[in-house]
From Swiss-Prot:
Gene3D superfamilies: N-(1-d-carboxylethyl)-l-norvaline Dehydrogenase, domain 2, NAD(P)-binding Rossmann-like Domain. It is an enzyme of class 1 (oxidoreductase). Keywords: Crown gall tumor, Oxidoreductase, Plasmid. Belongs to the lysopine/nopaline/octopine/opine/vitopine dehydrogenases family. It comes from Allorhizobium ampelinum (strain ATCC BAA-846 / DSM 112012 / S4) (Agrobacterium vitis (strain S4)). This is Vitopine synthase. InterPro entries: 6-PGluconate_DH-like_C_sf, 6PGD_dom2, NAD(P)-bd_dom_sf, Opine/Lysopine_DH, Opine_DH. Its EC number is 1.5.1.-.
């Protein structure tokens, strides 16, 4: 029996563990660990014990295997999954630095310049066989009490590895998912193919007045607020694609990704958000201090803009979102966000930046 370690105990981690338990039965053991600084979900699940996976194609009870000790969690694991937001990835990597990871593969699910962060933090001699990054998570999902809902299973999603994997290793990795995997040529393409910074910030900024005025219940995020901001969403997506073209990377439009992942009959992006059932019950954040701004803007879009400037691409829509988000958070995100300088790439040219995003 093979083993995977899942670092994080949020919606994705628990859904992934339940999926492995129900779909792969006794073939794979999934062990969950969470940082000691953020164990609310971890401890709550421990108190519940057995959870119920509720999915579109299969469901059933499973008992997550929780491990308090990081060393024990990753011991003999062929694959180690980071299932935490960008903000938490670096902290976990700094805890992993004390261990020899040279016989494992590290996966950021999803990735966010994780290959670059690994290179900056992990010792070369103890680094993983490869780092794999994905554009998105395999599912739209959330846990409510003891029920873990797979709201939508993506038909496929995109991944890239920093090193060439053997056929056997690739097959074992792909078998962990119910989805088809599309392999991109490099992790840099994955970083710029994350559509969260395109969709989330415009939606929550449109919702600002309703959130701050305490409206209850709030309209649903994808049903109401994202469609209301669709012009800005589209502007951001167009700028994202311009950066990709300038850097010679690969990607697709945000709407193409939505259709590829979830299917449906929508003919344009606004219609997709208004009609896709997997998003129907996704609520709107009740505070503006939310990862839609603190992660998607501060830690991803700011870096996109800095790279765009080096590549000679004009991104006025992104800059306006960053400024507006900064006003909401009372920060100058161009100063406090994740920057080229903070990633040891100050003064780098586009070729060096792409190389670094690929973990080199």
């Amino acid at each position: 029996m093979s083993k995977v370690a899942i670092l994080g105990a949020g919606n994705l981690a628990l859904t992934f563990a339940g999926d492995i338990a129900r779909r792969l039965n006794e073939e794979v053991t999934a062990v969950i660990w969470a940082p000691t600084t953020n164990r609310r979900n971890f401890n709550e699940v421990r108190g519940i014990g057995t959870l119920e996976l509720v999915g579109p194609d299969y469901e059933g009870a499973f008992t997550p295997q929780l491990e308090d000790d990081l060393e024990a969690a990753i011991l003999d694991a062929e694959f180690i999954f980071l299932t935490v937001p960008t903000l938490a990835q670096e902290g976990i990597l700094r805890e992993l630095v004390k261990f020899d990871l040279s016989e494992t593969v590290l996966i950021a699910l999803p990735g966010s310049a994780t290959s670059l962060t690994c290179k900056n933090i992990l010792f070369p001699s103890h680094s993983p066989v490869a780092v794999i990054e994905s554009t998105t998570s395999p599912y739209a999902c959330r846990r409510i009490g003891e029920r873990v809902h797979m709201l939508g299973v993506k038909a496929c999603f995109e991944v890239a590895a920093t090193s060439l994997l053997s056929n056997d290793l690739t097959s074992r990795f792909e078998a962990l998912f119910p989805n088809r995997l599309q392999w991109y040529k490099d992790a840099a393409s994955i970083f710029f193919s994350n559509t969260n910074p395109v969709v989330h910030p415009p939606g929550i900024l449109v919702a600002k007045d309703a959130i701050e005025n305490g409206m209850s219940p709030l309209p649903k995020f994808y049903r109401e607020f994202v469609p209301a901001a669709i012009e800005r969403v589209q502007e951001l997506d167009n700028e994202r694609l311009e950066i990709i073209a300038a850097l010679g990377l690969e990607s697709e439009t945000g709407f193409t990704y939505s259709k590829k992942w979830y299917g449906g009959q929508a003919t344009e992006w606004k219609e997709f958000f208004e009609t896709y059932e997997g998003y129907a019950e996704v609520g709107t954040p009740t505070t503006m201090h939310h990862r839609y701004l603190t992660e998607d803007v501060k830690h991803i879009m700011v870096l996109w803009v800095q790279i765009a400037e080096v590549a000679g691409v004009q991104v006025p829509a992104m800059k306006s979102v960053i400024k507006e988000a900064g006003n909401v958070l009372y920060e100058d995100l161009f100063m406090t966000g994740r920057t080229l300088a903070s990633m040891n790439l100050g003064g780098a040219n586009p070729y060096r930046i792409v190389d670094a995003l690929n973990g080199n």
